[in-house]
Amino acid sequence: MLNIAIVEDDPQAAGTLTSYLDRYAQERGTTCNSVIFNDAVDFLTGYKASFDLVFMDIELPGLDGMEAARRLREVDRSVILIFVTNMANFAVKGYEVDALDFIVKPVAYFPFSIKLDRAVKRLESRQERELLVPV
């Protein structure tokens, strides 16, 4: 099961991501548990490292997605971060906060599923390494 946070202020965009996650889970025979946050402050307040993946909009009211990602990295270095934006010029800045990738709005399912496959592979690789480390 994947635990996913969607930090997105546009209800339509958040709904699209949620429906794509449902479709992805059905196609791959897995489960995606997603939680939507309408702004970055709500997401970061009381944050606990319980998410495997975060989809983060860059243009958010109040605290923008780039600054939210910087603050997220202060408390959780390992969560996988994918930016969702209509501003492709921010893609390079995403690497400053160790983002795995970015998705340009409007989001289409095929590129979304490829990026999610990449995130899942990274999670699986991380879990395998954790299993191999002797205690």
Question: Residue ranges of each PLM-predicted region?
Answer:
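Non-catalytic signal-transmission and effector/linker regions of two-component phosphorelay proteins
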Residues: 1-5
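Conserved acidic carboxylate
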Residues: 8
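A generic structural motif
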Residues: 25-34, 79
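CheY-like receiver
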Residues: 45, 51-126
